[in-house]
Every structure is written in structure tokens, then in C-alpha cells.
């Protein structure tokens, strides 16, 4: 299966809601060419894993609320998610519907991703997929990045592969107390993040010093790192505004 650009890693019930979902790894050929050529990773590609609700395309899933199967209770479902559903997620969904991606056993998937950098959850929360999938497919991958907003309720073993996505100082403190490394989004204009956290080196504010595949900070506990990470809210302007509205509403309701 090494000649395929993408494979289905998982097809089954969501670990969040029980509804059908599919997890698809894309960009394998590009990542493999980069690995063989020894190209500077700053200019290269990571394998992208999309976690999509089954039965309808991502745009309609969001409109109907069916995206809860892959996004859970993430606050960014309310209009502040930086992901453009009509772009990557919809394109992958349509390709999947055309039969472009073959289903791979976990053993085949592990071999296909061996030596490659993987971005876990380009869209969708990794907690929606059984942890054994990540445990198996990442066994030989070069590196990975991963984030989950479901850190309170998911399989806590996921902390080995993922950062806890946090949107407030309180969430950050709670996630750390539960044993997670944290990735905290802060409002636009914030000059600093939580204590013991570094500014994301791939962010605009840091001068885009490193690409994620070079930095490797956001790999949960897998790499033995202890630092936490923060980043100012990003994406198109109206989504940044929506994020700050949601955070303000959340604080007022506490």
C-alpha cells in the first residue's frame, strides 16, 4: 500500500458519541518523497489525519450537529474553529466517497506511516478514535503532533500522544493537574501565556521560527518533553472575534 496517497486508519463508532466516523491519513506520498530526499522539513509535508463524521459531509455534519461525533464539546464548534470545512475536510470526504482511500489494517497502517511525520487531527479530535489505533500506527512514525479538547473525559492514555487543548487559564491548570501537557490558545494581543509555557515557534508572533515537524514540541508525553505551549488565537478575523466572545461569555457564566 506504499503507492497510495491516503489510507483509512479507522472506520467505526466514535468514542465520544458512538456515531459512525472515519479516520483518514492523507499525504503519504509527499511525506515519503520528502523523507527519501532528506528535504528540510520546514518546506516539507506531514501526513495529515482527518477524523470525519460518517454519513454526511463535514459542512452538513457541522450544520446538523453531527460533528459532535468527531469534535465532542469543543468550544470552537460555535464558530471560532480555524479549520475551513469547505476546504481540506470536504475535499478528503469527497475523495473518500469516490473510493480513493483504501481501508488498512493496523499493521499495514503502521508500516505505511513508518518513518513519516504525522499530524494527528488536522480536523477532528483524536479522542473520537480508539486509543489502540494511535498506539499501533505511531509505533514506527518519525514524529507526530496531536491535540484533544476531550482531555477531561477521554481515555487518559491519550496524554502520551496528545496535548490538552485549553482555552482559559483555569482549563490549563486543570489539565496540568490531571497529568497533561497543555496547548493553550489566548486572546489576540496577549503578550504572554500561562506559566511554564513557551510561545509556539511556528506562530506568526514567534516569527515562524520552526515548522511543526521540526519543532516536535506538541507530541504529548511521547518525546519526554515537559514544557507546555501557548499561541494567540489564529484563523480569519471573524473567527478570532468569535473566540474572544465565547471566552467572555464563558467567564461571565462561571
PLM-predicted stretches and their roles:
Residues 1-253:
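Class I S-adenosyl-L-methionine
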